């Protein structure tokens, strides 16, 4: 989770979780950390596992939250998700979503990377 300050990040993650739950996803786990990466939120969408990266920006300059995920960050999230899948012996379809939040609202990007 990237934010202008940690408190805003926690608020954005909570809002993202509620947003996704209101749209039918089931919460599994939050803030899963490994030495090589972190998964902000783990959800289930039917039988599919969804690894969610939450991005928050207080302003839209420099592309805002939507454009703030780098290839390196996506790689770390993929690596963390792969480890999570192995540890939990998950044999199902998985996807990576991004929740981009700013003061104007939330944007859900399915299959973001």
Curated annotation (Swiss-Prot):
Domain of life: Bacteria
Protein name: UPF0102 protein Shal_4069
InterPro entries, A to Z: Restrct_endonuc-II-like (IPR011335), tRNA_endonuc-like_dom_sf (IPR011856), UPF0102_YraN-like (IPR003509)
Sequence similarity: Belongs to the UPF0102 family.
Annotated Gene3D superfamilies: 3.40.1350.10
Pfam families (alphabetical): UPF0102
Molecular function GO labels: nucleic acid binding
HAMAP family: UPF0102
Annotated organism of origin: Shewanella halifaxensis (strain HAW-EB4)
Coiled-coil residues: none
């Amino acid at each position: 989770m990237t934010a202008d300050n940690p408190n805003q990040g926690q608020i954005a993650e909570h809002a993202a979780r509620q947003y996704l739950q209101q749209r039918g996803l089931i919460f599994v786990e939050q803030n899963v950390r490994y030495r090589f990466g972190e998964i902000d939120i783990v959800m289930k969408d039917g039988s599919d596992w969804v690894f969610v990266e939450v991005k928050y920006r207080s302003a839209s300059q420099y592309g805002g939250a939507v454009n703030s995920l780098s290839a390196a960050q996506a790689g770390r999230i993929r690596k963390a998700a792969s480890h999570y899948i192995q540890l939990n012996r998950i044999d199902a379809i998985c996807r990576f979503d991004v929740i981009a939040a700013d003061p104007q609202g939330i944007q859900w990007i399915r299959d973001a990377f």
